[in-house]
């Protein structure tokens, strides 16, 4: 009696095969990769005429300060900029990708980019990777509908607020905003408040540090204030580098001439055997 086999189509849904594999490898002694701790303070607020973004300039590699003066405010469009926190490679790659898409859209339509367009592209990309792209963003810009400020989390969720903070120093920066922010801020008041919030993150968070970068976006204009404030300047007295106290200098070469010439003469006769 012949028995016919029927191919049963696989059931849909998430496959946990790799999870079982990871558990087996862990039981056999394989150490799973640990969570990567990153640090940054990025902020943004809406003022009377537009949007102001701010960021610190420290890039870390674990416990090491890899770069003291990096740029965390990324260009998206002439009227839109984006601050990035998280893994530097992810934030730069995501913002560059969306920036190129916005440029193609401007070429095709002949119109300025809208902030909501950049927001949609960013959140769709991050949501599709379920948080594995480590990019936490503060997006700000001014378009035909006015100023806009959004926060985008690595999993794809977003917020729309008059002021926002992200990164490991976000709590310290948010405390400054909640205490001093008010509607209708002038340009100078907004810049001062953003700089103060970034400094709060720099001095209260080990992952944030160095200088303060600020970007002011208004209708038809933008101003990027690179190294607007340096809360931790180098304190070297000499332009050549470190200065040492007297009698503790490091000498690479030292030539000391003798005070007088010494002549050695032989006295007596050699001993006989």
Curated annotation (Swiss-Prot):
Cross-referenced InterPro entries: Ntn_hydrolases_N, Pept_T1A_subB, Proteasome_bsu_CS, Proteasome_sua/b, Proteasome_suB-type
Keyword Nucleus found: yes
Keyword annotations: Cytoplasm, Hydrolase, Nucleus, Protease, Proteasome, Threonine protease, Zymogen
Location in or out of the cell: Cytoplasm; Nucleus
Record propeptide residues: 1-37
Residues annotated as catalytic: 40
Gene Ontology cellular component annotations, sorted alphabetically: cytosol; nucleus; proteasome complex; proteasome core complex, beta-subunit complex
Gene3D superfamilies linked to this entry: Glutamine Phosphoribosylpyrophosphate, subunit 1, domain 1 (3.60.20.10)
E.C. no: 3.4.25.1
Major localization listed first in the record, in broad terms: cytoplasm
Annotated SUPFAM superfamilies: N-terminal nucleophile aminohydrolases (Ntn hydrolases) (SSF56235)
Transmembrane intervals: none
Family label: Belongs to the peptidase T1B family.
Protein name: Proteasome subunit beta type-7-A
Gene from which the chain derives: PBB1
